[in-house]
Structures are given as structure tokens and as C-alpha cells.
Amino acid sequence: MEWSLERMREWVAGGMQSVRECESSALGTALCLALLFIWYCYRVGCEHTSPSLRGGFSPEPRVGAVPGVLASELSSRGGSSKLRQIGGVGGGGVSDEELNGFAYCQSSECFRCTKPGEGLNQRLYHSLQEYAKRYTWAGMGRVHKGVREQGRYLLCSRPSIQKPEVFFLPDLPSAPFFSREAQKHDVELLERSFPALLAEFESVYRLPSSRTGSSLPPGWKANSTPRGQWWTFYLVNQGTPMVLNARRCPRTWRVLGQLRTFIANNVFGNACFSVLSPGSTITEHYGPTNVRLRCHLGLKVPSGCELVVGGEPQCWSEGSCLLFDDSFLHTAFHDGSAEDGPRAVFMVDLWHPNVAAAERQALDYIFTPGR
């Protein structure tokens, strides 16, 4: 085989052309990958937009230490859940949510009621990482999954019978109503304490004189309703003790301290007397989370009163507890007459029995104030 300078020149030129084509192809591939990465980051950012958390709650346990709590000067916030009025009541327009049969809470004092905001998912994940660094990742599988998927879950616009508005813990058994056996100790304690709780309710529930010009007894909060009146007297509001109210109900406060599963140290915990006047309806709404069971102890229950959770109706009875998951769509109404008087219950939030102790500790840490 003969070698010539011309032949060698052709081979060199061909090789250089091949190199240039390879460089061009590699550059194009790199640009495509960069664009795909930018698009992916944009989609992930959009999916993790979620409601902002509000609150001012201490991570330290407070319900058990009654004297110290009542002596300290704690800031109190109202616990009203002001729901949009529907059906033309109040002169406002009807929103898409109201046309679907429920309305979102509008209270600026309630962390559940705030508008969706930027960064909650990132803050929750950061808090979970802080907790795991300080303690452990052991037992955090469901909490980690709930935080990771929270933004996507909350942005889902599909109608649902269960849709907690702040945090969903996956793989929890769910039902609108639970048997009293789910929290047997605390249910029995509350029912044994019925006479004391009823007496203290009657001591604080005093209709003000018309001469005072006030529409509420001292310490009570009014909640917006489509019709009628719904009042609440909080001893613990979103994890914060209401000091002045607690001083007026010392026996009820002691009962709270004896409950084994009361959510005392995060924003999902409340305890209050709740009054519904005759002719009142509470607009259908969702609670903030599925990690709790809401317990109602009937204090005064006239005829014509009903609680509907997830489409299932139940009636209260005096001296007995109802346990339900308020992350299901729920409402309550009092269709009795003025002569029947108000419906009154003692409401307290207990842990869902299938939330493990390690998960409770982590959720107390994550859902403390300022996080």
C-alpha cells in the first residue's frame, strides 16, 4: 500500500471534521439537559407551594403545670373560625368553594385559615431535619413522607370527603367517627367529670345584660355562621392556654391535665366550651390535620341537634362523648326552637390512636410557634 501526502491530508481533514461534529453534538446535548433541569426545578417549586403556618406556641408542656401557667402572663389569641357566609347572607358573593358545599375559614387568628403561601413545605422539612439531627430519624418514615408530599397533596383540587387543610399523615386508619374504645381512658375520665364540667360551663355562660351593649359574655368568642350564633370559650386555643379563662374553670383545667392523649403542645390542640344557639348552622369545613380525634362531651343537648361528619349524622347526648375525625368534611346544626335553649358541648382534641409516640414528639416539635 502506497502512502502519499495528498492521501494523508484528506485523512487529517476528515478527522478534524468528525471532531467538530462531535463537539457540536455534545454542546447541543448539554444545552438540552440544562433546559430540562431548569424546567424540572420550576415544576417542583410550583408543586411545593403551600399554606403558611401561623401561631405563637411554646414547645414546653404546659397543661399539667396549672399553677405556673396561670401565674404567668401568656399572650392570648382568639379562637374564632370565621367562615364565609353563604346563600346571600352578609351580602357577599358566593365562591367556588361555597358552591361545592363548603367554605374556607377566614380568621386571621387561626393558622388553618390563612391563605396558601410560599415556603411552608420547606420550613416543615427544615424543622423535621432539625428534629432528626437533635434526636433521631427512627420512626419518622410517615412524618417524612407527609412533609415531603404535603405541597402536592394540598394543591390537589379534586373534591374529597377527607382533606385536612394543613398536614396529612399518610397511612393512618381513617373514618368519620371512632369508637370510644379508641381513647377509652380519656373518654371515661371526661364522662366521669361531666358534673364538674357542666357546673363550670354554667358559671361562665351568662348572657350579658342588654344595658351593657355587649353581645357576648366575658371570655367568649363569636364564630361567623350562615345563620344563628356559634360561641366558643377557649381554655386552650391552638396550643396556647387562655389564662383568664382557665382561672375561671379550675376543675376543668385539672381534668385537661389528667388526660393522657390531649394535644397540649402544638397548634393542633384545642379545648373549649362550644355553644350553638337554636336555628344555627355551622358551614361545612375541613379541620387542619388527620393526626387528631376531636372529642365532644355533651353538656346540654336539646332535640333537633345533629353533627354530620363525612356524610354520616350523629346526635350528641348529655354526659357522653363523641369521637370524630374533623379532617373529614363536617357540619353541625341546631334546628330546635328558642324555648329549647342552646346546644353546649365541651370540645377537646386528642391524638389519633395510631400516631406513635415518636411521631407525636416530632409533630410537637415541627408544629411549634415560629416554624
UniProtKB/Swiss-Prot annotation:
InterPro entries reported in the protein's UniProt record: Asp/Arg/Pro-Hydrxlase, Asp/Asn_beta-hydroxylase, IPNS-like_sf
Keyword NADP belongs to the record: no
Keyword Membrane part of the UniProt annotation: yes
Extracellular topological segments: 1-25
Stretches in topological domain Lumenal: 43-371
Entry GO CC: membrane
UniProt cross-references to Pfam families, sorted A to Z: Asp_Arg_Hydrox
Topology class, membrane: Single-pass type II membrane protein
Location of the protein in the cell: Membrane
Database matches in PANTHER family: ASPARTATE BETA-HYDROXYLASE DOMAIN-CONTAINING PROTEIN 2
Family as reported in the entry's similarity comment: Belongs to the aspartyl/asparaginyl beta-hydroxylase family.
Protein name (record): Aspartate beta-hydroxylase domain-containing protein 2
Annotated organism of origin: Danio rerio
